Amino acid sequence: MCRNNASRAVALLHGAPARVETDGGLIAVEPSGSGASVDMGEPRFDWDAIPLAYAMDTAALPVGWEGLDQPGAVSVGNPHVIFFVGDVDAVPLETIGPEIENDPLFPEKVNVNVASVIDREHIRLRVWERGAGLTRACGTGACATAVHAMRRG
């Protein structure tokens, strides 16, 4: 279960704090207003924790696909690769997403994020979610992208 779904399930079914087992481990979910908040845990930047197939600098991977290059990689309970681009809508995520998701560099496959920094408080994001395809919302993708943006300065 993804963390978005875990938080919604707890909010809708229980309305009380809970701990939920996900593929990324046990997470704490707290009711919050009409929804719930999730403790995402610490992001992991080590190549073997993401995981990648071999050691490399996860702040700027020395790889590229069709005009997308030097992405960052981070695990927030699941693996993400993040590309900063000028226009997220110009990236053919429907075609390049599955190619990157299934690249041998990512032994557990990977979520593919393309992001544009709007200003210091806003990022526009599109996500190709591993195993699900293009998605309209991805909480771990938003967290991974924000962490990588802060990491890049």
Protein language model features and the residues they cover:
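Helical hairpin unit composed of two closely spaced alpha helices linked by a short loop
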Residues: 140-142
